[in-house]
Structure formats: C-alpha cells, structure tokens
From Swiss-Prot:
Family, similarity comment: Belongs to the bHLH protein family. LHW subfamily.
Organism: Arabidopsis thaliana (Mouse-ear cress)
Lineage of producing organism: Eukaryota, Viridiplantae, Streptophyta, Embryophyta, Tracheophyta
Protein name per the record: Transcription factor EMB1444
Protein origin, superkingdom: Eukaryota
Gene giving rise to this polypeptide: EMB1444
Positions of short motif Nuclear localization signal: 548-555
Function description: Transcription factor that may regulate root development.
C-alpha cells in the first residue's frame, strides 16, 4: 500500500480526536500473524515531526515512545484482541477504565501498558477484510460511532477493490478557487453526523486543501492532511474538464446521495452496526423522507454523465434530477451523447485501463496497466510501454467467506488496480460470486499495447479510446444461466478484427456495454484459462476431482502384495510345517534349522550304502568267560573288567571290511549310557552311520557303526580309551 496507506492513516487522525493510527498487516505464513505495516502519530509539539518512529527522538514524548514500541509486537491470528478482531471481523471499542479495573492481563498480553501509561483512554480496532486490522488510539474518551467504522472500511476497500474507482479520489482533490468548492446540503450533513457539521464547514471554507504529492520524498516533515472529516467522504466530485462538468462515481459505488454537486456516503446504521462491504454501493439518500434506503436494482456499470445532463439544466438542477433517479432505484439509460473521461485536469496523469486475468489458485486477479503520468509541457508525448502486474481481488465475497487463509496473495499492499471506466461486475439472480470466472484472449492484450503506442503523437483521448475499446472486447458476453458440472460450456471469443474494424472516434470516447462481462459457471470455484495467440478456442473440459479412496484399517494394506513377495510368504509357511517347532521360530531361526536338516539329510544320502554292510555282532557269550578272538583280518580291540574272576568283555571296537568303517559294541547295565556314548563318538569327529540297542538278559547291548569325517583315519585304541572313561568312575565307586 506504500504511500497511499500513509495518507489514509494520516487522514483518519486529521481534525479528529484520534492521536495515532496503526495498520496491522496480515502475513500469510504458518502460522499467520499480524505485523505492523505502517503507522501515523499526531505530534503534539508543533514543528517537530520525526522522520522515523525509531529515531530515538521520542524520549520526551510518552505517546510517541509507546507507538514506537508497537512495531516490535506480533499478533497471532485468533490470539489477543487484535488477532480475534482479524479472524471474526467484529470491531471493538476499548476504554482505559475497562483495562484498569479487572483486566490488567489484557494490557500485558496486547502490549498496551505503555499506551495506557501515556494517557491513551480509547482504543478502536477495526478489521478491514483480508488485508489486516486498523488500530486507533485517542487521549480522550471517544464515544462509539458505527459510521466511523464504516468509513474506515470504505477507505481500505478503495485500496483493495480493483472493481471500484481509483483510490486517489478519496485522498486527493484539486480545488483552485473558493467558488469551485462544492457545498454540503444541510439535510445530508445533519443526517450523516450532526456533531461534526461545524468542523466540516470550517474545513471546507479553508483556502484549498493541503495535498502532499506522491513525488514528495520527505513525507514525515509535512503537516497532516486537511481532508474532510473521517465521518464523511465525497463519493463523487464535480470536475471541470475542458469546460465540461462531470460527476464521477468513486470507488464506493454509484448509488449515493447526489445533491448540489456533492455527495456524502452515509450508511443507515440502524440496520446493522457493521455494514457488509458488498452492500456499500447500495445506500441511497432519500430527500423526501430524510432517510436512507438500500437499492439493488441500480446498474453499477454507468460511470459518467453527459454534458447535457449538467450544463443545459444549470448544473445543480441536473444533479437534482439525477438524485431523483437514484431515489427511484432505476438504472441509467444508455447515453446517446459523448461520455466524459474522468481525467483530473489537463495537467494530470492519464490513468490506464485494466483487463481481467483470472488466477488458478485463488479466484480472480487482475492484470493492470501501470499508470503513466503526463508532464505539463508534453501532453501529446508518447506513452511508455505498458507493463502488467498482478493484484488480488481481496474484497470479493468469495474470499471473505473463505477467510484470510485463502487469500494469500492479498498481502501485496503495493499500488492497487485503479479503473477508469471499466464495467462493474453485476451478479444476476441465478448466479453467485463463486460461479464467476473471466476468460479473455491474450491477443487483445497485444492490441492494447499497439493501440497505445501507435497514437503517441496524436490526441491523448484517442489513445484512451483505443485502450477502452480493447478492454470492452476483452470481456465477453455474460452467460444467462449455469450449466451442470462436467458439461462443456459455450465460450465466446472476441477477435482482434472487431477492434481494428471500429473507426477511431474524434472524442476518443466509446460507451461500454454493461453486458460485456463473461461469467463461466463452476461449482468448485474460480477457474479459467487464457489462450495464447495461436489458439482458436477455449478448452472446454473440466477436470473431475478424484474420489477419495477408503483408508485401510491398521494392519491391512490397501495395495495388493507383489507376486514374488506372496510366493516367499507361502514357502516360509511350508517350512514352518516341515521343521520341528518351526511355527514358533523367527524367520532367521527357521532358516538356520532348515540348513541343519538339509545337511543331515545330505549326510544320510551319502552313507546310505554303508548302512547295509554293517557286520553282525562279534560279541560271543562264553560260559567259561574266555576271551574270544576275532576271525577278521582287520583285527579288533577288547576291553574287559579285571577283577577277582573273569567276566564277559564290556567293550569291543572292530574294523569292518570297508576301510575307515568301525563297529563298536558294548554291554551296559543301564540304557542311559547310550546318549553319553553317542556324544563321545561325535566328539572324536566320527560320523554315526547306525546306532541300535537290544535287550539281552539283564544287560543292554549297544551297537554303533561309525566312520571318520572327511575320510579321517582313527585308531581303535583311541576310540576304546575314550569309551572306557565313561565306565571308569562307576567301577571306582564300587
């Protein structure tokens, strides 16, 4: 918002009881916060106007120091009074008595301790749409006034609404002589604000208004603007352009009280304390009843009055006739005469037109041509090339309904769009704001640039006419009714030939048709496309949103398993059934047990032929107890118990016919020695090819057929000695 924002804050404090005005800007971050964007503070010491609030010159000024401290505060959206006003849109009047009684925590939480100590007695916080919040402070107690709240919102609406007229009409006026000053009708003035009528007359009787030019570099040393009081705002100004008087509607709409060449924007506050921004243009002053009423039938697309409406009837009488038409609520007919262009003066800058360019992410935004100022001595010089810049339509009902989180692009407070004579968007009965989209062709944008550049040495009005005719064709015809979602929509494309075929008018004025607004309906919000120069038609297909998939329950997967993974799961399930105790093992343990079983089966297959060649028992029971001698050539080793008399041999180790294979036989009194013998054999790195037990009388006969691992050759005595160690302790105990 820059310099214009400073002007608005200064105008609010000028000639009023407010001592400072602060604008808290809504920054669309995560989380969204409000930071101090601009501030104006009335200096109590005449002649002292510090250039910055942080210059250290407020040590002797408690109010200036308190305002300077506000720049360090950050308000979260929805927290504190400022944050709550921003999210709710409801303004709040706060008095010092309320804070001092029982709400001391509010001072600390909102950072108002220094302000209360500096003498601030009234604080007003007003939400201005999705832009942010305005905070006012006064050293005296200011009574609640809904008209002031409405006026503040009007001022910021003028900055953020591209469909309205330019904001400079509110903040600047060029009145050169006292005779040209408009007079305020006493009836309107009394109804608007009887308490400030004297101050308003005094201000209007001053010799001109002190206006600070936008080119002024040192703004801080200028005196505050002497605007009309903040409870009034001129919505139309009578301007003299080449000897012609024109009544120009301002940014707040065209349905206002018009009497004696002056209009006062007033609001019937008995209906509601806060007037919706979308209804600001519908307040009409009724001279017969002395009250105000709303009208929704007026066509807001008319912009200017003809010369005959003003001059032929004596000026004021013509305005009275127009006021009667406003009271009747009827729309103005199409003008048959030339339409006046609302240039400030012949020395003022020429404001360029704008074209609508929709945005895909946030509704409609607009491509506007940059304003170019004309020098006093070069009225017919070439206009510079037009440059397009984006600005957000943050004042629309759609963005107000969706909240500040949706309008993220509305935080750019640079110089906003200013319309010269663009037709206002009119909402039909069967169409809502959420169904509007604007479609235009980029070919017409090039034509607008060519038209303005080719007439550089000609008349300035002819250049404006070419730009206006281009803009009139950029907006296509308004559709009568909405089509169902998903169906193709008929798109009307305006061609460049229609611009070229129209002959340039001498006055450079083309009357615009209010129906040159294209609305393409969509049930999901704003959506449109801009064609390139080679395109012939608009795309008609709309992307149908995908249906939400059902979420999978915990433990379930919405995706089907890959085939290879499913096969692995099946094989593991089979292994758990084959391997003993496999159902309780982990996958690693299951695989380890499987490997052991595979190795065992491999060894069995290798030694299967050896099991059939096992020799019969060589143990012979002799009654005499004599030692039997083996008849085999390989030899055998015997172990007997030596005692008082000879007994049957206990252990025998014998070589079999096949090399490396041995037969181990023994008689044991207990069968429990079988596992101990098997462990000893395995410890000797021998492979047990066969192991059997047989009951013989009171003793148990045990037989093993063994083989050395990896063809290892073992001596019989080594095996015999190891087995004797098993029985030796038991013989000793006996």
């Amino acid at each position: 918002m820059g310099y214009t924002l400073q002007q608005i804050l200064r105008s609010i404090c000028s000639n009023t009881d407010w001592n400072y005005a602060v604008f808290w800007k809504l920054n669309h971050h995560s989380p969204m916060v409000l930071t101090l964007e601009d501030v104006y503070c009335v200096n109590h010491e005449r002649g002292l106007m510090p250039e910055s609030l942080h210059g250290g010159r407020h040590a002797h000024d408690p109010l200036g120091l308190a305002v300077a401290k506000m720049s360090y505060h950050v308000h979260s959206l929805g927290e504190g009074i400022v944050g709550q006003v921003a999210i709710s849109g409801q303004h709040q009047w706060i008095f010092s008595e309320y804070l001092n009684d029982s709400h001391s925590t509010l001072q600390v939480h909102n950072g108002w301790e220094s302000q209360i100590s500096a003498g601030i007695k009234t604080i007003l916080i007003v939400a201005v749409g999705s832009c942010g919040v305005v905070q006012l402070g006064s050293l005296c107690k200011v009574e609640e006034d809904p008209a002031l709240v409405t006026h503040i919102r009007h001022l910021f609406l003028a900055l953020t609404d591209p469909l309205a007229d330019h904001a400079s009409n509110l903040m600047q006026c060029d009145i050169n002589s006292p005779s040209d000053r408009p007079k305020i009708p006493s009836k309107c003035l009394h109804e608007a604000s009887p308490d400030f009528s004297g101050e308003f007359d005094k201000a209007m009787d001053m010799e001109g208004l002190n206006i600070v030019s936008q080119n002024t570099s040192n703004r801080s040393n200028d005196l505050p603007y002497n605007f009309t009081p903040t409870y009034f705002h001129m919505e139309r100004t009578a301007q003299v352009i080449g000897g012609l008087e024109a009544v120009q509607p301002s940014m707040f709409g065209s349905n206002d009280c018009v009497t004696s060449g002056f209009s006062v924007g007033v609001v019937d506050t008995k209906h509601k304390n806060q007037v919706d921004i979308s209804d600001m243009s519908k307040v009409i002053y009724d001279e017969e009843t002395g009250g105000y009423r709303y009208s929704r039938e007026l066509d807001p697309n008319f912009q200017h009055y003809s010369r005959n409406h003003v001059r032929n009837s004596g000026g004021t009488s013509a305005l009275a006739m127009e006021s009667d038409r406003l009271k009747a609520g009827s729309s103005y007919p199409q003008l048959d005469s030339t339409v006046l262009t609302a240039l400030k003066t012949d020395k003022d800058y020429s404001r360029r037109n704008e074209v609508f360019q929709p945005s895909e992410s946030q509704g409609s935004i607009f491509v506007k041509d940059t304003e170019h100022r004309q020098e006093e001595k070069s009225e017919s010089s070439q206009l510079d090339a037009l440059t397009a810049s984006l600005c957000s339509f943050s004042g629309s009902e759609l963005l107000e309904a969706l909240g500040p989180a949706f309008s993220k692009t509305s935080t750019d407070y640079g110089e906003l769009a200013k319309f010269e004579s663009a037709a206002a968007i009119r909402r039909t009965n069967d169409m809502s704001h959420s169904h509007l989209t604007f479609e235009s062709s980029s070919e017409n944008l090039l034509d607008a640039v060519v038209a303005s550049m080719s007439n550089g040495d000609g008349n300035v009005r002819r250049e404006i006419s070419s730009s206006r005719s281009t803009q009139s064709l950029l907006t296509t015809a308004e559709m009568a009714q909405a089509e169902p979602f998903g169906h193709n929509k008929q798109n009307i494309v305006s061609t460049v030939d229609s611009v070229i075929s129209q002959p340039p008018l001498a006055d450079g004025l083309i009357q615009q048709n209010p129906s040159n607004i294209c609305g393409a309906f969509s049930s999901i919000g704003f959506s449109s496309t801009c064609l390139s120069s080679s395109s012939d038609q608009f795309p008609t297909s709309l992307e149908i949103p995908k249906k939400n998939k059902k979420r999978a329950k915990p433990g379930e997967s919405s995706r089907p398993r890959p085939r290879d993974r499913q096969l692995i799961q099946d094989r593991i399930k089979e292994l758990r059934e084959l391997v003993p105790n496999g159902s309780k093992c982990s996958i690693d343990s299951l695989l380890e047990c499987t490997i052991k079983h595979m190795l065992f089966l491999q060894s069995v297959s290798q030694h299967a032929d050896k099991l059939t060649k096992s020799a019969s028992s060589k143990m012979q029971h002799k009654d005499t107890g004599t030692l039997g001698i083996s008849s085999t050539e390989q030899g055998s080793s015997w172990a007997v118990e030596i005692g008082g008399h000879l007994q049957v041999c206990s252990i025998m180790v014998e070589n079999l016919d096949k090399e490396g294979v041995m037969l181990i036989e023994m008689l044991c009194e207990e069968c429990s020695h079988f596992l101990e013998i098997a462990n000893v054999i395995r410890s000797l790195e021998l492979i047990i090819l066969r192991g059997t037990t047989e009951k013989q009388g009171e003793k148990t006969w045990i037989c093993f057929v063994v083989e050395g691992q990896n063809n290892k050759v073992m001596h019989r005595m080594d095996i015999l000695w190891s087995l004797v160690q098993i029985f030796q302790p038991k013989a000793t105990n006996r």
